């Protein structure tokens, strides 16, 4: 059944997919009811119709000729019960069910496919003039009589389009096949349940029997609610595939309301859970098998018949399809324009990382289990791998979210963010592969060791219902695969590998949180379904080891989604955007919660939006604990950022200034130092690379030409105030005259931040005569501008404050490398410049930024300035203020 939406606000019919359609005048007077239009452009008023249950089983509704035939066919199934052998009855009903199921999926499917592609059924009607009153043929007369018996004697067949009349006849074939399919299935259920003296209530404990019946009945009732809700939503038009024959004006879009907002294709997915409820009540693997058989054929019907027609009628236009293709190709630019490895999908023999993943997966999944001595060792390996993966991935994402460690490291080494993200994707996928390979290997080892023993079921927590466990386990494993690929289809590889943590929104094709695909129905589909495959493995092999692994997988998944991923998404897109109701939540609120509770929840949410936090963030009661934990983490990180371990300035002064020098005849004064503030205990300072002039005075009678001054770090000399036992490493000068001065610059300076002092030494020895006041060498603060238009001014500041202190360039456009290559050690020069830039701008870069210049080696100061602006732009887009979380 297809499903459409009634868009009452639309007044223009969208014929994007039917370019040749023209609209003619209605063929009958306008009356109440929806307006239809055929694919040839003929418009008409669609008369009211009834569903098959009301049509066939409501005694107040007059039955048509075909409907009487259908009822006769349905009741004829009772003749089978005249056979006394119940097993033969089961075989007969199974054969009948298979016949009707094949008639449904392949018979109706073939008719619908040809109607969609070739207008086959309508062409037949026109070819044989089935609705022409002048046609006196037996077939035409019987079909016309059938329509009149449906619509009444006053129904004017000729006034209605052939398409609509053909649809009315097609409906009766659908009624016959669908009702016969369901009735024969119910007969199989009944016969299977009562065989062997009502086996469905025997040979089991009472609690288990009641549990089966209650759970099975619940599935059946839920199935019934799905069908009723679906029919109330899409009406007869879509229930009977009306859009294969004509269109209803203002029904140009797919509907996502009611149960259609809860799960994708509910008529084909959860619309069959009742079949499994019947199997549970009947306690029959036969019923389970034919339920799986019928459901499988229905999914084939959906894939090959329903979906192609939906895409044809309601799908995107050619331009939209091309746009989608382009976006998917853009998604691959982060992965060298190749689909990245996900598990072992998209494997490429030409990628070294793929080969390594394959080797590791085979090693941990097959080779190690073949040679392992015990299951315990495999269990320890699996737990160890999962803990390693959980801690490393969660810690990496947390640090990237708050501190951008991966991005900063990459940009500092002049590595594009796309490349760093690609490397992260390889690491992430490799660790995930190792965990699942280890889990598979543990269970393979268990199978190999137990299969040869006398009691293969020993060690299992339970060993009953093996085939049921295998079916449910494989179903859960398949569900995880399906969910994972659905997630990738919705958010791309960018979203799958947490691209929001690494790539700024301006450089990504994803600007907002998606609500398409599987995310239309669930906000976090991977919350449960992302690990349900591990639960499936536990069902197949219910060992203690697998139970522990399920716990590890679930806990890690919960922490990663709720405390890392969701926290980052809230700060990036806003809490209201992230916490919007999913389709399932909307459906539960609308259809399954009492109205009084709905009003209360609506009032609570409205109150919270108005009287919530100072930032206007919406909170829900179920999120209070999680938010409080997340806020505690934020507070901890904020305190960590704001904390410092600097020694007090007064303590530094006490360490530096030896009071015994207060009345000394020797003096040292430092010229050109700057004051940090007006407070007396604040150290004077200079900036890195700025020459420092020191003046000395010594008594003439005691002066020696071998007196000398050295520059030292206080933290290295504070333990010895009267004698220096540390080398000055070349940062010294002779004091040949009793009075004089000397400029410390270039190699005689420390090119790093810290607190320093000058020491006056006597007669070429290390005896200290005087220690200067302490002073601080600190980085100049340079603000990186927001826009590239300010790059020239910023480059001038870089040249003045940093480059001119190391190398001499004539202007900001001159190439750096030719001048730097003239130095004795060009790498050290680059390291020094990059260090000064990093400290001055608070943007970390490494010397490699000067090496990745291309073939022309024309990197200039202006180019460096532009690179810094770009890096700042990337980091700011990925960052947020912890104390002021973003809200939308």
Curated annotation (Swiss-Prot):
Primary localisation category: endoplasmic reticulum
Catalytic activity: a 1,2-diacyl-sn-glycero-3-phosphoethanolamine + S-adenosyl-L-methionine = a 1,2-diacyl-sn-glycero-3-phospho-N-methylethanolamine + S-adenosyl-L-homocysteine + H(+)
Assigned EC number: 2.1.1.17
The entry's keywords: Endoplasmic reticulum, Lipid biosynthesis, Lipid metabolism, Membrane, Methyltransferase, Phospholipid biosynthesis, Phospholipid metabolism, S-adenosyl-L-methionine, Transferase, Transmembrane, Transmembrane helix
Gene Ontology biological-process annotations: methylation; phosphatidylcholine biosynthetic process
Residue ranges of the TM segments: 64-84, 92-112, 174-194, 206-226, 262-282, 285-305, 355-375, 378-398, 424-444, 471-491, 528-548
Stretches in topological domain Lumenal: 1-63, 113-173, 227-261, 306-354, 399-423, 492-527
Main function: Catalyzes the first step of the methylation pathway of phosphatidylcholine biosynthesis, the SAM-dependent methylation of phosphatidylethanolamine (PE) to phosphatidylmonomethylethanolamine (PMME).
Cellular component, GO annotation: endoplasmic reticulum membrane; plasma membrane
Membrane topology type: Multi-pass membrane protein
Cytoplasmic compartment residues: 85-91, 195-205, 283-284, 376-377, 445-470, 549-888
An example molecular function term from Gene Ontology annotations: phosphatidylethanolamine N-methyltransferase activity
PROSITE patterns xref list: S5A_REDUCTASE, SAM_CHO2
Protein name listed in UniProt: Phosphatidylethanolamine N-methyltransferase
Family: Belongs to the class VI-like SAM-binding methyltransferase superfamily. CHO2 family.
Localization annotation: Endoplasmic reticulum membrane
Pathway: Phospholipid metabolism; phosphatidylcholine biosynthesis
């Amino acid at each position: 059944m297809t499903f459409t939406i009634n868009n009452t606000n639309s007044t223009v019919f969208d014929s994007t997919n039917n370019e040749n359609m023209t609209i003619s005048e209605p063929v009958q007077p306008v009356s109440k009811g929806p307006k239809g239009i055929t694919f040839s452009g003929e418009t008409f008023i669609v008369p009211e119709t009834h569903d098959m249950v009301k049509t066939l089983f409501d005694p107040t509704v007059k039955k048509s000729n075909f409907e009487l035939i259908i009822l006769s066919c349905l009741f004829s199934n009772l003749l089978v019960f005249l056979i006394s052998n119940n097993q033969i009855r089961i075989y007969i009903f199974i054969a009948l069910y298979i016949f009707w199921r094949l008639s449904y999926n392949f018979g109706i499917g073939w008719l619908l496919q040809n109607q969609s592609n070739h207008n086959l059924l309508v062409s037949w009607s026109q070819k044989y003039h089935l609705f022409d009153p002048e046609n006196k043929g037996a077939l035409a007369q019987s079909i016309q009589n059938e329509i009149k018996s449906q619509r009444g004697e006053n129904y004017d067949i000729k006034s209605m389009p052939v398409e609509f009349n053909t649809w009315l006849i097609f409906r009766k074939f659908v009624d016959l096949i669908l009702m016969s399919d369901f009735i024969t299935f119910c007969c199989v259920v009944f016969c299977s349940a009562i065989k062997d003296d009502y086996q469905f209530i025997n040979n089991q404990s009472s609690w288990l029997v009641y549990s089966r019946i209650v759970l099975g009945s619940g599935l059946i009732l839920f199935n019934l609610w799905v069908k009723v809700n679906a029919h109330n939503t899409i009406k007869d038009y879509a229930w009977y595939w009306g859009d294969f024959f004509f269109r209803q004006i203002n029904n140009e879009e797919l509907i996502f309301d009611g149960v259609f907002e809860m799960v994708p294709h509910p008529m084909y997915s959860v619309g069959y859970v009742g079949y499994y409820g019947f199997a549970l009540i009947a306690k029959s693997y036969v019923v389970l098998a034919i339920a799986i058989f019928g459901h499988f054929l229905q999914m084939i019907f959906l894939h090959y018949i329903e979906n192609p027609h939906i895409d044809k009628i309601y799908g995107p236009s050619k331009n939209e399809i091309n746009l989608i293709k382009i976006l998917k190709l853009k998604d691959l630019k982060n992965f060298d324009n190749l689909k990245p490895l996900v598990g072992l999908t998209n494997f490429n023999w030409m990628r070294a990382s793929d080969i390594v993943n394959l080797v590791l997966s085979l090693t941990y999944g097959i080779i190690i289990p073949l040679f392992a001595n015990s299951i315990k060792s495999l269990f320890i390996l699996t737990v160890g791998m999962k803990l390693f993966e959980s801690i490393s991935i969660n810690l990496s994402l947390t640090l990237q979210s708050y501190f951008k460690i991966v991005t900063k490291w990459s940009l500092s080494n002049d590595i594009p963010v796309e490349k760093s993200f690609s490397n992260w994707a390889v690491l992430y996928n490799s660790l995930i592969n190792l965990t699942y390979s280890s889990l598979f290997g543990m269970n393979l080892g268990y199978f190999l060791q137990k299969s040869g023993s006398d009691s293969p079921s020993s060690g299992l927590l339970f060993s009953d219902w093996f085939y049921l466990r295998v079916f449910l386990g494989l179903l859960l494993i398949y569900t995880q695969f399906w969910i994972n690929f659905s997630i990738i289809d919705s958010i791309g590889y960018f979203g799958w590998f947490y691209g929001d943590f690494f790539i700024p929104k301006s450089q990504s094709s994803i600007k907002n949180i998606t609500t398409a695909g599987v995310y239309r129905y669930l906000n976090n589909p991977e919350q449960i379904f992302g690990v349900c495959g591990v639960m499936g493995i536990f069902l197949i092999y219910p060992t203690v080891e697998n139970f522990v692994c399920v716990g590890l997988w679930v806990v890690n998944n919960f922490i990663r989604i709720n405390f890392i991923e969701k926290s980052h998404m809230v700060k990036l897109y806003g809490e209201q955007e992230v916490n919007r109701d999913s389709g399932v939540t909307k459906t539960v609120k609308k259809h399954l919660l009492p109205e009084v509770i709905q009003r209360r929840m609506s009032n609570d949410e409205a109150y919270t939006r108005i009287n919530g936090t100072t930032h206007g963030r919406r909170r829900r009661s179920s999120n209070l604990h999680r938010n409080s934990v997340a806020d505690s983490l934020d507070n901890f990180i904020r305190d960590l950022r704001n904390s410092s371990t600097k020694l007090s300035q007064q303590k530094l002064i006490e360490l530096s200034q030896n009071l015994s020098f207060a009345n000394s005849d020797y003096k040292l004064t430092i010229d050109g130092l700057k004051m940090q503030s007006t407070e007396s205990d604040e150290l004077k300072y200079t900036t890195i690379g700025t020459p420092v002039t020191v003046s000395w005075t010594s008594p003439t009678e005691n002066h020696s030409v071998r007196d000398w001054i050295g520059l030292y770090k206080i933290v290295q000399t504070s333990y010895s105030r009267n004698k220096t036992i540390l080398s000055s490493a070349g940062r010294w000068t002779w004091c040949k005259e009793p009075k004089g001065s000397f400029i410390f610059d270039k190699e005689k300076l420390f090119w790093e931040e810290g607190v320093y002092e000058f020491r006056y030494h006597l007669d070429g020895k290390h005896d200290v005569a005087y220690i200067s006041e302490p002073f601080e060498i600190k980085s100049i603060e340079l603000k990186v501008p927001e826009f590239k238009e300010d790059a020239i001014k910023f480059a001038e500041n870089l040249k003045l404050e940093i480059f001119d202190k190391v190398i001499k360039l004539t202007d900001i456009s001159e190439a750096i490398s030719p001048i730097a290559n003239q130095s004795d050690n060009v790498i050290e020069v680059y390291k020094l410049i990059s260090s000064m830039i990093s400290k001055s701008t608070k943007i970390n870069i490494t010397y490699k930024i000067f090496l990745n210049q291309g073939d022309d080696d024309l990197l200039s100061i202006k180019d460096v300035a532009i690179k810094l602006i770009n890096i700042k732009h990337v980091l700011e887009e990925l960052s947020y203020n912890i104390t002021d979380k973003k809200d939308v």
